[in-house]
Amino acid sequence: DIVLTQSPASLAVSLGQRATISCRASZSVNWYGNSFMZWYZZKPGZPPKLLIYRASNLZSGIPARFSGSGSRTBFTLTIBPVZABDVATYFCZZSBZAPWTFGSGTKLEIKR
């Protein structure tokens, strides 16, 4: 199985600043020119929400403050600028090789 190493485990960012979350795969998740990496946002009591698919594509309805980048094994989720509503846990997920696997999550908090 592909192992995803996500960092940092937690992150405190001031409102209006940039949050950067990294995800490294144990092997390439590229296939036919696509990077099969997704990013999700999860809030307590709510199902995970897809933010980014295939590494850099913004899901419909997701604000452009969210962006994804990377290829092969190294990927980044950026939130810029961070808003109060972004407090959540963020997960990367690979959809290249079954069983699909998730990173361990990054908890985003607002720095006061």
From Swiss-Prot:
Region Framework-3: what ranges? 61-92
> Which portions of the sequence form the region Framework-2?
39-53
- Which residue intervals make up region (Framework-4)? 102-111
Residue numbers spanned by region Framework-1: 1-23
CDD domains assigned: IgV_L_kappa
A Pfam match? V-set
- Region (Complementarity-determining-1), start-end ranges: 24-38
- Which keywords appear in this protein's UniProt record, sorted alphabetically? Adaptive immunity, Disulfide bond, Immunity, Immunoglobulin
GO process annotations (BP): adaptive immune response; immune response
The source's superkingdom equals Eukaryota
Which intervals of the chain are annotated as region Complementarity-determining-3? 93-101
Question: Where do the segments described as Complementarity-determining-2 lie?
Answer: 54-60
**What S-S linkages are listed for this chain?**
23-92
Q: Name one GO cellular component term.
A: immunoglobulin complex
Q: Please state what the protein is called.
A: Ig kappa chain V-III region TEPC 124
